[in-house]
Regions:
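N-terminal Rossmann NAD(P)H-binding glycine-rich loop of SDR-like oxidoreductase domains
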Residues: 1-19
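Glycine-rich NAD(P)-binding loop of the Rossmann-fold in SDR/ketoreductase-type enzymes
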Residues: 41, 55, 74-82, 128, ...
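Catalytic helix-loop patch of NAD(P)-dependent Rossmann-fold dehydrogenases
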Residues: 77, 112-156, 184
Length: 326
């Protein structure tokens, strides 16, 4: 388990360990759970860590928030070279499943159509259009996964996860315009997934990798939208949501919440549900049920992991002390 001290890594370690799996964590932080302290850029360390394991779940990465603190070479070293080190070590060790946790940020500029265009319907077939070094290096790492699978027959599943971080939004206008939990519940309609559902997708990917050989999947909460909603979503998102969930306005009003005026993209998880048998639980409908009952819509696992931030030193909204979990 690379990145075993991160949001997803720690969640996976907790769940897998509780179920009796023997988990070896690899993380830069000395507090890494159950594991080895070090970098995936260290090829010899990676090979020692992978020896004897049945599966690799690769969550370690430089994220989008690191763009402001790390240069492009650092992104290439960690996200590309580090991933290649893991892939080659896993292939040499005869590992039975390699799960690469990627990101919907690989789609890049394809996610933001022109203002007068319908919302983008994002499936795995949409070609990536690089927007920043984070997305570019994650796309390159995905290509390496496919290459090593084809050359070495390493069973490899790529999970392009949407937002699951608990930190506040990085856009000033969003933080100023929305309560944090309000925004995250809205995002379940089209671009967010709960941490618990990401964990279940990873577990299924490990179990299905051998049969699949190779696969690339979007991991996001199941959207209620359909292609015929895309035009209206750009300028009349509240009316679309109202037709699908007539009760949402009253539930939101009790909290002083509001819906986004415009939605620019919709992530489609149909392939993951079909191929992996994935059944995400935490969608917008579930959130409304929780809010109606006076309960938190986030999973106990997500609440238990909490906010970690992305930097050891203060770095704006990405610093643990400056964030809010809602």
């Amino acid at each position: 388990m690379t990145g075993s001290s991160g949001h997803l890594g720690e969640a996976l370690v907790r769940v897998l360990s509780a179920e009796g799996d023997d988990v070896v964590g690899l993380d830069l932080l000395s507090s890494a759970r159950l594991g080895v302290t070090g970098s995936i850029v260290d090829r010899a360390l990676v090979r020692r860590s992978v020896a004897g394991v049945d599966a690799v779940i690769h969550t370690a990465t430089l994220h989008k928030p690191h763009v402001i603190t790390h240069d492009r070479a650092a992104f290439v070293a960690t996200n590309v070279s580090g991933t290649l080190n893991l892939l080659e070590a896993a292939a040499d060790a005869g590992v039975g499943a390699f799960v690469f946790v990627s990101t919907t940020s690989t789609f890049g500029r394809a996610l933001t159509p022109p203002a007068d265009a319908p919302a983008a319907w994002i499936t795995e077939d949409v070609p990536p259009v690089p927007k920043n070094i984070y997305g570019a290096t994650k796309t390159a790492a995905e290509d390496l996964c496919e290459l090593v699978h084809r050359d070495r027959q390493l069973p490899c599943v790529i999970l392009r996860t949407s937002r699951f971080f608990p930190e506040t939004d990085d856009r000033d206008d969003m933080r100023a315009g929305f309560d944090d939990l309000n925004l995250k519940v809205n995002e379940l309609l089209y671009r967010r997934v709960d941490l618990d559902d990401v964990v279940s997708a990873c577990r299924l990917a490990v179990a299905r990798a051998g049969a699949l050989g190779f696969g690339r999947y979007i991991v996001s909460a199941t959207t209620p939208f359909a292609p015929d909603h895309l035009v209206a979503l750009r300028g009349e998102a509240p009316s679309v949501v109202r037709r699908l969930f007539p009760e949402y306005e009253q539930i939101f009003a009790l909290r002083g919440w509001k819906m986004l005026a415009s939605i620019d993209r919709v992530y489609v998880n149909a392939r993951a549900r079909h191929d992996l048998g994935w059944r995400p639980r935490y969608d917008f409908a579930h959130a409304l049920d929780c809010l109606r009952a006076g309960q938190d819509p986030r999973s106990p696992l997500a609440l238990g992991i909490g906010a970690k931030g992305y930097h050891a030193e203060p770095t704006g909204v990405y610093t643990p002390g400056s964030t809010s979990s809602g």
